[in-house]
Amino acid sequence: MTTAPRDSVVWKLAGLLRESGDAVLSGCSTLSLLTATLQQLNRVFELYLGPWGPGQTGFVALPSHPADSPVILQLQFLFDVLQKTLSLKLVHIPGVGLPGPIKIFPFKSLRQLELRGVPIHSLCGLRGIYSQLESLVCNRSIQALEELLSACGGDLCSALPWLALLSADFSYNALRSLDSSLRLLSALRFLNLSHNHLQDCKGFLMDLCELYHLDISYNHLRLVPRVGPSGAALGTLILRANELRSLQGLEQLKNLRHLDVAYNLLEGHTELAPLWLLAELRKLYLEGNPLWFHPAHRAATAQYLSPRARDAAHGFLLDGKVLSLKDLQQTSDSSGLGPVIQPLSWPVGSTTETSGGPELSDSLSSGGIVAQAPLRKVKSRVRVRRASISEPSDTDPELRTLDPSPAGWFVQQHRELELLASFRERFGCDWLQYRSHLETMGSSPLSTTKTPALSTPPLDVQNLETVCSPPAIEDDTKESPEKVSEEGRVEPEPQEEEREEQDKEEGSREDLEEEEEQEQKAVEAELCRPMLVCPLQGLGGVQGKECFLRVTSAHLFEVELQAARTLERLELQSLVAAELESETETQGEPVSEGSGPFPGAPVLVLRFSYICPDRQLRRYAVLEPEAREAVQELLAVLTPFTSVKEQQPGANKDPQGARFQCLRCSCEFKPEESRLGLESDEGWKPLFQNTESPVVCPNCGSDHVVLLAVSGEVPNREQNQEEQSADSACDLADHGGCPSRPDGIPPQTSISHDRSSWSLSPSPGCSGFRSVDHRLRLFLDVEVFSDSEEEFQCCIKVPVVLAGHTEEFPCLVVVSNHMLYLLKVLGAICGPPASWLQPTLAIALQDLSGMELGLAGQSLRLEWAAGTGSCVLLPRDARQCRAFLEELTGVLQSLPRTQRNCISATEEEVTPQHRLWPLLGKDPSAEVPQFFYLRAFLAEGSSTCPVSLLLTLSTLYLLDEDPGGSHAESPLPVVSDETSEQPASLGPGPSLQVREQQPLSCLSSVQLYRTSPLDLRLIFYDEVSRLESFWALHVVCGEQLTALLAWIREPWEELFSIGLRTVTQEALDLDR
């Protein structure tokens, strides 16, 4: 092996280290090796320089060898460098290399170790260096932490604490739970557990006393992880893309400065109450949560922030933007509607942290939150106290608490939460949209109370001022201080004022509750008698407390047996299915302790369409004496609600009518589009897992999607037009002929969904091209069509280039039963069509003499009058281009025989006379070489320009083409009955100019973007000039991007024998 030619792996590695060994030995550069290469080196070392015993540790001094042996000298040099290497990266490619252990024995001085896809059970030699490692990265290698931390991989030993380890990255693994091996990382400061399958961290992070940065994003956590001791050192916590519904537990992290809980399931701003105690917090990310869609989200969030954090000198960053003075003023206005006090803190440490309820003052801080100030004693003042007598009402379920103690506040907060919960249950998941409706009814539970931490933030300050304005009785009290002397001034007691206002708010709230109950009783009629049931919780059938089941015309209630309180209220309009559970399933369920079994009791199963998982399934064991008859009575009442839901418009399961919306990026898509997403990280998937989400957003990859409700009042035609406008990839305003957009992104990525917008770009298909807005149809009939017998057939909005011109312009191509019209789009598509459409050209269908489909089906060339005129349509989407050609061909075939011109469409062929042939191959006799052709857009700063991308097996070209060609271009041939059946190709073709070219070997990586799925960046690195460059491209559909990556990957990986690196970033940065 060592006597092989100098191009062997050993000689190449030795030569590389002789040139760049200083950077490796100093730790500035990382030595990256394939596991197969490391195995080969170990075999050579053991053969010529070893062998060494399994207990060999420390630096190895090599024996002397003859100096005239270049092989031995090369191996000695290589072994010495490996022993002194500080940073190592190992990459494992499945199926490459020899079976057996992967030994890292030669590396004696490692400080940083990175493992990518390395089977951890095959890694040997870690026990000799783990105590000196400062940074450890392990991706796509482990399923449990103890495999690496406790057993040291393939060494299978009992490891002691990793005393020097400061940073650990265990992202992109298959971790489902943590274990006690984390206690070995006592000095750890940075921990990354993102992109795993963790559901609960339990208490395994409590031993990491020095932890400062914790990243557990993209997991399945439902609770905030506990960090110890008391989270004193933690400064950054990233919990993005989990399943958090509450932030309880964050109040312990006193020094937290950066918190990221974006894309979770936080529904209300009341869940942000723990943020009040985080005085050092400076960055907060909440985007993608249900509360983020609140119209007053920023103002409502600022209400729950600590005054010290909100008023920081450098500004508080909320969702990446500084909290503005306007947000704080809105908070101040909303807080000024009623007395506001500091929210209660959780018992997280000492008793001093949870005390201080009665000593809170009424003065507001600059940000609208009350500042706590000590009470002053004024001896010269005479306080006149008014008696506050409050008797319990007969309708109150329990006595009202007047004591201004924490217990009294808790009761008030609890009542407010119940009222808010009833409001949300009434309106479902879209409860924020009914805010104005609720306020006009006067039953809004969103009135501001004394405790902003556990109350809903004000939605509309102007509306709430009318609801929560103080009574006119207080005017008398304002006049009394003017009638007394300065020394004997009358001043009400602060606590008495709070008590009175609390009484009034509670009284008004109880009145609203009574009115709601009366309205409910008056409107909703009982559909059957109450049934005695026992709820069965979960799939295990754990028995709950017995209750009555009431069914009204709109709701289903669970009512307590003794106090007759409503335990649960479910909407019948959300009922999906009502069925009787089979006896075999019921007999196999366990019974909880303390609750006797119900042998033979039938089980009623109800399924609802709520988003919350706890409310989707209800199972009741019917305990009536005649249980079978009672169940049949319930089914007879509930089944009509499920059948009505199935008959509603949009409730069918037709995949063509259903649409989803992503909660992260608000993108709307069809079910079939969710399977077209790119796997940009395909080369780095776990070797032992291949999972796929059933419904994911094709734009950002999130699985937090909801099914949009289809309104039955919208006509199908209008709905189809809106979907076609959203799905089309050809809603192009202008490129080349008109100024580009300032953001540099082609306009087809920004499509309006306004009701007043025009739908001009239907999706491929006959029904799509034939549907048109009725206003546009009227304009065509009156202003464009010249013959009274002329009828509209189809249309498409597409960029067009006329013969003899180089710039393309947006155009509406309209086909009637006699003519083909080109209507130039002058500007914004709004208002009367005459203001933004200009008739440019009219061609009789019988004059068409040729139709040619361009390369890869991305353009369509039309000729008329025997080649005297021509134009090129540039949809750039092969599927849409072929669909329109098929539609146009059908119109031509439907012409009368006297007007029918026997022409058929041809496809552009690559021959030795083709314009691309010099770039593909110089041998005219050779077959057509393999290539990939794509029409796209090149982003240059803030503007874009149309280009063509040509890929061969060795070179990448950026081309500037003139689609219109010159006047001397040969016409398209006419294929008639007398001519040959073999279609002739186009002549010399459009002019061509190479803008830029790069060899395939210089391609280093491909960069994609989650929020811009149609943009990509090809990054090149020239090893000779050591310069890096890139091509920022934009395609018109996701299929083109997928095909482009697939075509590049095969020859590139064959050239380098490793996977092509694709990097996915969150957003497109136009400044780079």
Swiss-Prot record:
Basic and acidic residues compositional bias, start-end: 478-492, 501-510
Gene Ontology CC terms: cytoplasm; intracellular membrane-bounded organelle
Intracellular or extracellular location(s): Cytoplasm
Molecular function terms from GO: protein kinase binding
Positions with biased composition (Polar residues): 441-454
Annotated InterPro entries: LIP1_N, LRR_dom_sf
Repeat in keyword set: yes
A Pfam family annotated for this UniProt entry: LIP1
Residue ranges of LRR repeats: 109-130, 132-152, 164-185, 187-209, 210-231, 233-254, 255-276, 280-301
Segments of this protein annotated with the region Disordered: 333-366, 441-522, 741-762, 967-993
Keyword field contains rRNA processing: no
Keyword set, alphabetical order: Cytoplasm, Leucine-rich repeat, Phosphoprotein, Repeat
GO biological process entries: protein localization
Phosphoserine found at: S388, S390, S393, S757, S761, S763
Function in brief: May regulate STK11/LKB1 function by controlling its subcellular localization.
Entry similarity comment: Belongs to the STK11IP family.
Subunit structure: Found in a ternary complex composed of STK11/LKB1, STK11IP and SMAD4. Interacts with SMAD4. Interacts with STK11/LKB1.
Record protein name field: Serine/threonine-protein kinase 11-interacting protein
